[in-house]
Amino acid sequence: MVQERLCPYCMKVLPAQVISCPHCGKVFVGRNPAGSLPVGSMLGGRYTVGEMLTMDGEGILYSGVEDLGGFRVTIKEYLPFTLAAERGEDCILHPKKGSEVLFKTTRMDFADLYHAIQRITPATGLEAVLDVVEANNTVYAVLEDLGGTPLDEWLDARSATLRAEEACAMLRPVFEGVAAMHK
């Protein structure tokens, strides 16, 4: 049985092989930059990739949908720009020539890190890792999507300076989570 995928925008069931959502009208083609996964890609048979949110030297962060439960997730793709050459039309990521061993080793480290975080969350102040998926010659960490406001925006919107006691109280669960990770 083929798993139905959900539109990453309106979360309604998509017919097979569509390039736009018949419900909300959003077009999937060309939404993400070259080298990233296309909107509407399926991972692990249960996650639909949405738009790229950010990218850094380690990889790309996408919005996404968990198709079985119908809830939003964040998908972190391991894509080290210094080691990765290109992504084929089949979405397979290829390492740069001469970087194959380092690419494979660091890919395994990425998977190990997110498996370790998965074991200690959600009991800590860290974002829960729901799944770790290996596909396309790389690894994807599927994270809970809590929504919310980014810290820099929240701080900019505050009229008063954040007191040290407030900052410590807010960050205590994060510190405890990091400490648990290093045990």
Report the location of each language-model feature.
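Conserved short submotifs of the Hanks-type protein kinase catalytic core
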Residues: A135-P150
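AlphaC helix of the protein kinase catalytic domain
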Residues: L151-L162
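A short, low-complexity linker immediately N-terminal to eukaryotic Hanks-type protein kinase catalytic domains
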Residues: G30-V49
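Protein kinase glycine-rich loop
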Residues: G50-D56
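Activation segment signature within eukaryotic-like protein kinase domains
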Residues: M170-L171
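Protein kinase catalytic-loop region centered on the HRD/HxD motif
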Residues: V174-K183
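ATP-binding glycine-rich loop module of kinase domains
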Residues: D67-A111, H115
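Activation-segment/catalytic-loop signature of the eukaryotic protein kinase fold
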Residues: D131-V132
